[in-house]
Amino acid sequence: MATFLLEVGTEELPASFVESAIQQWRSHIPNSLEEHLLTPQSLKVYGTPRRLAILAEGLPDQQPDQTVEVKGPPAKAAFKDGKPTKAAEGFARKQGVEIKDFELRDTEKGEFIFVQKTTLGKPAVDVLADLIPTWIFSLEGKRFMRWSDGEVKFSRPIRWLVSLLDDHLIPIKLENSTGTISSDRTSSGHRVLHPDPVTIKHPQDYVATLEKASVQVDPEQRQTLIKEQVHACAKAVKGKAVISEDLLAEVTYLVEWPTAVVGGFESEFLELPAEVITTEMVSHQRYFPVEAPKGAKLLPHFITISNGDPAKSDIISSGNERVIRARLADGQFFYKADQAMPLAEYLPKLETVTFQEDLGSVRAKVDRIQANALWVAKQLQLDQKVTQQVERAAQLCKADLVTQMVGEFPELQGVMGEKYAIASGEPTEIATAIVEHYLPKGANDQLPQTLVGQIVGIADRLDTLVSIFGLGMIPTGSSDPFALRRAANAILNIVWAANLDLNLDQLLTETTAAFAQTFAKFQPEVQQLRDFFGQRLRSLLQDEQTIDYDLVNAVLGEKGEHTQRVLVDVLDGRDRAQYLQTIRTNGTLDTIYETVNRAARLATKGDLASDVLDPKGVVQPKLFEQSSEQVFYDGLLTLLPQTQAAQSSRDYQKLVQGLTKIAPSVSQFFDGDDSVLVIAEDADLRANRLNLLGLLRNHALVLGDFGAIVKS
């Protein structure tokens, strides 16, 4: 067994690409080696801003020989009068064997020729020499560039290549912007701390050799070092570090030899909102903020991660202190200047901000958000006070976009709106809604907690969805430039989390009609929006609510045919899906599945409308020939109030109890001593019996379409 090393040395790589490349190689390379019969005992992928590396231990020196059986032509086509035909000769030539190697064997289709063909395994060095370039250039990332005259693309120019199998060099040549890069044993140390070339004698020496050259190649080790140093620096200034996982991941891939350096600034800057200070530190400067040991009060300190000389930490600290002072001084100026007038007076300036080229300004969007918010408030039957709060919050929700602070720090939209609203004397409910209406900002982000914030958030996203759909810019595949999937997901999650009794279908109809009146040349189709929300419902129910796919189909329809019903009552759709999952788990579904499903399948041969529940008027007892029909009919009469109660109160337990109780009667109807032939020759008898089955199907349909459910 051998140890294999590949190191690709480059110009400074973007941190996001290094992290992505490591994940890609961790996924792809083990599969590639296994496919080529060179599975190692262990494989690690390393990465820094200047290199990507693979270290595989326990790699076979050579592929194993492989013997495969190849089926040839029929014997009667391969031989004529005992002599090989051209077909036999061609097959032998193609497989690299001789006629004497043929084996005749009987099969179900007659006698055929077979040969045993052995392929000799290649040395690992030769296989790796072919694979390595494909691994390098299969990496994907943003803004790749061509670094030579050919089609070769990579994130940054490749400067060196180390490729070893034990102490043997694997010969590789790559075309690059500076010519041809040939593999050798020479790597590079830290650009500042160890600029001299580094020789790698054996792959097993790689990590230790680079560490001596001030490069920690293992990102997990670098991250551990960073966390330890950051905590130590914070403790030294009697505070605790605020470590964001995103920032920690980013700085891990920005440095090769991390050194945490603490810096400070004047306490007067702490009068700024904490969000302004931390945004400048984290998003712009990649600093870790420092808080008081107890509570969340910021201290006038920060911690930066240097990739330079630890001996020069004082100089590094001073330089960063100058930067943060200047940035926070700008923040002080913006904060004071923005409060020179009330937040509401910024509204006219929104005319200068374009929402979308064909859709006008953000000021016009605000008017649409207000209208949407009032429709939501009306549906929820809110009192006048809360409705007025909703209207005012919707009016002010985008006003901070034209403040100087948000112009400098776009990440603070909504946050500064809340601060400025309070400073302007707006009620807390309105100020909070301004910041909350942007929530959630991502898949795992928190949701708005106040009713006003929830309503304005829904109204804003409804406008975005209807407007962009009106332009025909419907998301396709992975392309979703306006984040419409995220917007629809947010609406559904807000409704579910807050248990808002909303008719989303009606809201889509109202907002679409209003949009069409405002923009006559753009006509969004409500059905397209329904279908889109149906896709999001399906995804959320399966992926986040962990509902089985067939139970989701039972609620939405296998082709989305029940989506509109769910949009009319989104809470009910979720509750039905969850209840179906519950009764599958506890076994209740199995007790009614066969009966209901059989009835539903046969009922398709009838013409009873799916919303009919009362047997009176659609079933004629005078036509009954067997007692099982009467018992079935009586069971439906008993089931009716239980189903109606389930519809009005969403108490589907009563419905399932009723279906469980009627199941034996239906089984008797089908298979008992007094069973009947449903598809009778007499048309009236046939229709009467199909209506009985159709009624049972309809009662079950109140919970879900049992025809879509797969038997457990």
From Swiss-Prot:
EC number: 6.1.1.14
Pfam families: tRNA_synt_2f
UniProt cross-references to SUPFAM superfamilies, sorted A to Z: HD-domain/PDEase-like
Signal peptide range: none
Keyword ATP-binding included in the entry's annotation: yes
Catalyzed reaction equations: tRNA(Gly) + glycine + ATP = glycyl-tRNA(Gly) + AMP + diphosphate
Keywords, in A-Z order: Aminoacyl-tRNA synthetase, ATP-binding, Cytoplasm, Ligase, Nucleotide-binding, Protein biosynthesis
Compartments, record wording: Cytoplasm
GO molecular function: ATP binding; glycine-tRNA ligase activity
Designated name of the protein: Glycine--tRNA ligase beta subunit
Organism: Acaryochloris marina (strain MBIC 11017)
